[in-house]
Amino acid sequence: GDISYEYNKIENITNYLKILVDELHFNKVVCITNYTLKYGANYIVKNAIEYNVTRDELLIPEDLVKELKKCRNKRFIYIYFGILWEQRPSGHANMIIIDTVNKTIERYEPHGHSLIYDKKKNILKRIDSKFNSKLLNYIGLKNYTYISPVDISPKIGVQVKADAYNGMCVTYSLMYLQLRIMNPDVDQKDIVKYLLKKSRSEIYDIILRYAKYIEDKLKENSTKIIVHNDQLYTKTFQKIKKFVVINKRNEIDIIIY
């Protein structure tokens, strides 16, 4: 095709949501922000916060605060939340959803309470500590309530129950986001319970069909997406970007790339 669609391609979250918002007329419900996180020699991602497990650091684009202020008249704001290890070639995806009506900021973990290999929940505790102690205040949401993955899903989450092949965490996170957008007043736990009532094979089938649906939508809009991706990887990448780090001591540093 004209675009490189991959189920774990992070920029396709924003590309797909722009299509969804336009087609379903959700412009008053969802805010599509426009900021980037750039760090290292060649890493850039749109509308995201990242957690570096190796360094115990939370990476926040400086432009995030300004973009959130533009979204105060919308119900939902999404933030892709990436979990990275320096010694691994790939990471893991969560989804952050800000609900401006209920004054909440939730983090959805498709594995369940925490990463399936985070047996002692050390990663969960570190991330939640950074959210509660620093992040909410820094991004101007100190009066919001943080909803941890343990408050949304049982220990065994949707992705783990389905046992889908590695890399589908982006798609599971995006599916949860779409279900929240389309069912704004349904409790988060009920959305997860609805999916977990299904058998392993049913969940597996749902996520693969959903991934195919996203792929088809992206290919239908390939011309626009080529322009968006070119903007991200050429013009935007050349600009110097600042990002804020909440370090392992939960102190704030500012980094420039």
Short names for language-model regions:
Residues K142-F243:
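C-terminal folded domains that constitute the principal catalytic or ligand-binding module
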Residues H25, D56, K103, K121-N122, ...:
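Intrinsic-disorder/low-complexity loop/linker signature
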Residues I10-I13, P61-L64, K120, N132, ...:
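Short amphipathic alpha-helical segments that mediate assembly, nucleic-acid/protein binding
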Residues G1-M95, T100-I105:
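Cysteine protease catalytic domains with a Cys-His-Asp triad
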Residues L24-K28, Y39, A48, N52, ...:
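Short, flexible coil/linker elements and helix-boundary hinge sites characteristic
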Residues E11-V21, V65-K69, L136, K189-K193, ...:
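Generic detector of well-ordered alpha-helical segments enriched in charged/polar residues
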Residues C71-M182:
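Cysteine protease-like catalytic core of ubiquitin/ubiquitin-like
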